[in-house]
Amino acid sequence: MERRAFLKLAAAGAALVAGGQVATMLGLLERVSASDLPATGPGAAHQWVFIIDLRRCDGCGECTTACQTEHFLPADQEWIRVYRLTDASGGDYFLPVMCQMCERPPCVQVCPVTATYRTDDGPIAIDQSICIGCRMCMAACPYGVRTFNWDEPVAVPEEARHDGPDLQIPQVQGTVGKCDNCAHLAREGDLPACVSKCGMEAVYMGDLVTD
């Protein structure tokens, strides 16, 4: 098996185990045709994307911690998860997985209240003010990277609070959360938290339109 194929299978397998929604997800995906899903529109000013160099990642988890700190997430919520995997030759490597901001996102298609949508510059966002917590998007996500806010939000300083789909601090109880590409930082010309805190320089962010 080629390494690329192995990585895709390993990532999908880990996501399915983490999500615990195998049967439900497969049923949804059978009903969703990729050709029916919205792609990024032409003429967009930006198209933010992540690139991860697996040769550099040492599994330190600093990206996860940085994300949690930036978004005031509890310790049990990981918007970027680092998996330890073994390749066909028996060697170990680490695979960070976050929201892939799919070109044709199943989560957008299945959301019954349009709480999940694509922004003009590419990232898939969640408007927690209208999310009903049905978790259909979690079942549809092929990467298992969405989390549910079961508990009351963590204590957050007043100056750090922010309400909006681009940045929700703290998270709203009873809704779904996920990587937001640190869009609030990117629009100011700054790097996402996971990128700036990666000591191995394994995580990159680029713009498919301008770079």
Which positions does each model-derived feature cover?
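Iron-sulfur cluster-binding cysteine motifs and their immediate structural context
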Residues: 21, 28-33, 58, 62-82, ...
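Short Fe-S-cluster ligation motifs
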Residues: 89-104, 138-145, 161-184
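Short amphipathic alpha-helical segments
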Residues: 46-50, 95, 122, 175
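N-terminal secretory signal peptides and thylakoid transit peptides that target proteins
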Residues: 1-17
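Gly/Gly-Pro-rich "capping" loops immediately C-terminal to redox-active cysteine motifs
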Residues: 80-91
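Membrane-interface interhelical connector segments
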Residues: 156-157
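Short, well-ordered beta-strand elements within core beta-sheets of diverse protein domains
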Residues: 52-55, 180-186
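C-terminal segment of N-terminal export signals and the immediately downstream linker at the start
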Residues: 2, 21-59
